[in-house]
Structures are given as C-alpha cells and as structure tokens.
A protein has these predicted regions:
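Short, Asp-centered acidic motifs that coordinate Mg2+ and/or phosphate
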Residues: 249, 464-465
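Phosphate-binding glycine-rich loops and their immediate beta-loop-alpha structural context
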Residues: 141-252, 417-446
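Short helices/loops that flank or line small-molecule/ion binding pockets
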Residues: 452-464
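Phosphate-interaction motifs
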Residues: 2-174, 338-341, 355, 391, ...
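Flexible glycine/proline-rich
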Residues: 21-25, 35, 39-45, 49, ...
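A conserved helix-loop-strand patch within extracytoplasmic ligand-binding domains
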Residues: 482-518
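Short Gly/Thr/Asp-enriched flexible loops that form oxyanion-binding sites at enzyme active sites
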Residues: 259-271
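Beta->alpha turn/N-cap motifs
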Residues: 450-451, 467-473, 480
Length: 518
C-alpha cells in the first residue's frame, strides 16, 4: 500500500508493553455488561450451554402426585399395624389394598406401598401380610424432587444436559436466556488466500478464522466471519464500521504489530478509543484492545488479534474469552493444572510473560514437562502440546527439574499414557505413532532435539526412550561408543528401529549428470 492512501493520522509505529493482567483490567473497566434487552426466550430443550438471564422457579411440583416407588400394593399403613408371621392380616384386593406398578399414583385413602414380594396371595381377590408397614414407605411423595415455586437456577447459570431435564420436570417449557454474543472475525492481509485456492509464492493460507470461529463456539458465542480484506486503510475501516453495526464484539486478525501496513490501532483511534496496543506476553505481544461507537452510539469492543497462529490463539484465550464472559456476567471456567518437573533448562526474555508449550509424560513416577517448539507462527506446537507453562515476566527462565504448574490442554488420563521420545527424528516414527495409538491407545510424544540430547535425556530419566544415529568416525560404528561414553553406568536396551538410505534428489533424467557429491 502506498503512503499517499493512508491519512497522516493513520499510522503509529508504537507498541506498549502492558502486563497481561493490567491490560485486561484496563479493558474490562471500560466496558459494561449486557442489559436486560440482550436476552431471548427459547425452548428449554434447546437451551444446552446457555446462560439463564433471570432466576428460574418451578411452575409445578415433581412428581405432582404421590406415586408408587415400587411394584406392589397401595394400602393405608395403619391397617397393617400388628401383622406378623403368627398373626397375619388379610385384605381384599380392590377394597382394602390396590395393585400398583412403579410410578402409578396412590389411590385415595392410601399412604404406603407394600412390595409385591412381601405379600401372600391366598385367594383370587385376597392377599395376606405377615408384617406391618409405616406411612409413606415405598412412596414418592408429591414434590419429592422439585416443589412448585422452588428456585431451580439463579440468574447467570450455564445450563447442562441434566439441567434441561430439571427444567422440563418443573414444568418450564420456555426459558429466558442471555443472548449469545455475535463476534465478527475480519481477516486482513494482501498475502492471505482462502483454503482450496492454488498457492503462489508469497501466498499464505487464511486458516486463523476457522480456529477462532471454533474457539468462539466453544465459548458460547456466534462467530461471523467476514471475507478477507486487503491491506488498505479505507477498506479495513469500512469493514470494521460495518461489523460494529452488526456484531457485539469485533476481532481484526493481523494488522496489529508495528509494521507498515498494520492499521488496526489507527482505525480504532479514529472510530473510538484505543485502550491497549501491545501486551507483555510471548507469543501475542501485538494484541490490541479498544472501543468503537456505532451509529446508535453503542460502544463495541474491538480487538486486534495478531496474525501468527499461536499468538492469535493465546490472545483469544487470554483476552477475548474473559471479555465475552464479562459481557454476559459469568466467570471464566478454571483450567485444570498439574505439577510437573521441567525436562530441561529454558531461557526466557525478561519483561515478557512467556507461554511455554510443553509435551508431558510420566517417567519413573515423575510427571515431566518437555519444552516444545516456541515460535509464534508454529501452530503445530499447539497441536502437539499437552500443556502450557507460564514463565513470569520477572524471570529469565526456568531450571531443569524445577517443579512448576502446567495448564493442561488435554485430559490428564491421556497425558498419563504418553510415551516420551527425545532425540533424533526419523520419518518412520510416524508409523510408530499410528501403530501405538491404534493397537494400544498410547500417544507417542516426540521431541526432536538431536541424538546427543536424546542420550542425555535418557540418562537423566527425562524420556522413555531416545532416538539416536551417531556415527563414530574412528570405528565406523553407530551409537555404541557414544552410549558407553555418555551413559557408562546406565543399563539400556538398544533396538535397531529402522535401516535407511540417505541421498539427494535430482530433477527427472538427472539433466546435470550429477554422479556424486562431497
């Protein structure tokens, strides 16, 4: 984009370094919560995951009548008093005692149910009891589960599957819930192309909107994805203006760092108030937060979400998710955490809170966390990660074997079945990953850090096995000399996993007639 197309006020090359907590606090203090008109009535059976807008009270009791809790006979309990094996009492069926199935209403003037196995039928219409029964025995009294007028759920309660059953049992067919927030996602960038289009040099697939959309749906919002917008100030401004008219929250993806064509902060300043431009986290530093007023003078929250995938996901979870929860008046669910020992020393930049992705597993009864890839653009690092470790801003890193809290990205029971492999990578490991998962339900977690690092990890009991292909130039032998040198007192089993040939690829027909190389 040419500078002449951009207003003089349109570009500001600055980034703050606001601590994460203060950045979020600054935003939440500026925005309010949804008002009463942001609610809707929907069928109770369709309300899974929705948030109650007002308190919910039962319209009927459940059960709304006295019901038999067992198969048997309904009777007035006092008529059975004194019955015993030596002094049995007899009752006429249909006159004194009445046959009932579980759930049937009790006949008038009865207050107990005799279980069918406790009666002796002595005639076609007569039974005998050899024991007495107390009032209301084997009876579900009216309102045993829910009483008419009883508080079922307070306002702000997120409805689960069993909650829907309780609503219907209480006679509630429709329920007032808080409106699901509609969130605009605006991908920006000249280099972006939609999935399925043939790629040219310089093209980048736009997939962040898919990731962001599904995160929003998980959090109960309704994503509205706009078409890709080119790096043009006026075009982006136009789409943002349209989005704040239609949606409750707006996410502009990319256009948030201090580059030449990053316009989000300037657009927010033009349309409203810029609150934060730059947060002291890695990945995710270029995150932007602000408020923009639409034509109805209603302020809408606008985020600039970094373009790198990992940065985008972290900005979403750390800022967008709590903002959505704040707007509809609920708390952000807590994340499951476990204690783990860090597998190796890890440096970090002072002044930045780092979200370190880790692979996890149990080795010798110790839960280990092995640092994974750290780049902001490496989405595979999130795919492969089992958890996140937060390195504080005032820290220059973490020590090996340091105990720390790990926020889990997978269920703990799956992590406990992980097999940790550290060392040299080989494509055949993909086959092993598939086989272990399919046949045994185990997940092979591979940290490709080189053969020597693998041997060190195995020696330090930081892996289940190591991948290595180290050639001894003196003997021409693979691996053994290194194992003996670096693991002299460690008992190991050496498995020849795969044999392979290495070489180079040439163009079809070998036009340059390459025969060897050195």
């Amino acid at each position: 984009m040419k500078d002449s197309l951009l207003p003089l006020s349109g570009r500001k090359y600055y980034l703050e370094n606001v601590p994460r907590e203060k950045a979020l606090e600054r935003l939440l203090q500026e925005i309010g919560k949804f008002e009463e008109f942001y609610s809707e009535n929907i069928p109770a059976q369709d309300a899974l995951g929705r948030i109650t807008h007002i308190q919910v009270n039962a319209l009927i009791s459940s059960p709304h009548f006295h019901a038999a809790a067992m198969d048997g006979y309904g009777i007035e309990a006092k008529k059975t008093f004194g019955a015993s094996p030596i002094n049995p009492k007899s009752f006429k069926i249909g006159t004194d005692i009445f046959p009932l199935d579980t759930g049937d209403p009790l006949p008038i003037d009865t207050d107990a149910v005799v279980m069918i196995e406790n009666v002796n039928q002595i005639a076609e219409n007569e039974i005998q009891l050899e024991s007495s029964i107390s009032p209301w025995q084997n009876v579900r009294v009216a309102g045993e589960d829910i009483v008419e007028g009883q508080l079922i759920f307070p306002a702000g309660h997120q409805l689960s599957a069993v909650d829907l059953g309780a609503l219907l049992a209480a006679g509630i067919l429709d329920i007032e819930v808080r409106k699901r927030l509609e969130v605009a996602i605006i991908p920006t960038g000249d280099e972006l192309v939609p999935p399925g289009k043939e790629l040219q040099d310089g093209d980048l697939l736009e997939f962040n909107s898919v990731v962001m959309s599904n995160l929003l749906e998980d959090w109960g919002a309704v994503p509205k994805v706009f078409p890709i917008v080119k790096d043009n100030f006026e075009e982006i401004e136009k789409v943002v203006s349209e989005a704040i008219e239609k949606c409750d929250v707006v996410l502009v993806n990319a256009g948030s760092s201090a580059g030449r064509e990053d316009y989000t902060s300037s657009i927010i300043e033009k349309l409203g108030k810029l609150l934060v431009h730059g947060v002291a986290i890695f990945p995710g530093k270029p995150t932007i937060m602000g408020l923009c007023k639409n034509s109805k003078d209603i302020e809408k929250t606008v985020f600039g979400i970094p373009g790198y995938p990992v940065s985008a996901v972290l900005a979403m979870s750390e800022f967008v998710k709590p903002t959505l929860a704040h707007l509809i008046g609920i708390n952000v669910p807590s994340v499951q955490k476990v204690k783990a020992l860090l597998g190796r020393k890890t440096a970090s930049r002072l002044g930045m809170e780092e979200f370190l992705r880790v692979k996890m597993g149990i080795v010798k009864d110790k839960m280990l966390a092995i640092p994974a890839k750290r780049g902001a653009s490496v989405i595979s690092s999130l795919v492969e990660a089992d958890g996140i470790v937060r390195i504080p801003r005032n820290s220059e890193g973490l020590e090996a074997n340091q105990e720390l809290d790990v926020e889990l990205l997978r269920p703990l029971e799956k992590i406990e079945k992980n097999i940790l492999m550290v060392g040299s990578h080989d494509n055949a490991l993909d086959l092993l990953i598939v086989a272990l998962q399919r046949k045994f339900g185990y997940q092979l977690s591979v940290s490709s850090v080189g053969s020597m690092a693998g041997l060190v990890a195995l020696k330090n009991e930081e892996a289940h096995f190591a991948g290595t292909h180290l050639l001894d130039p003196d003997s021409g032998e693979y691996n053994w000399s290194y194992i003996k040198r670096y693991m002299p007192n460690v008992e190991v089993v050496v498995v020849n996993f795969v044999e392979r040939e290495q070489g180079i690829f040439v163009r079809p027909g070998n036009p340059k007639n390459i025969k060897n190389f050195s």
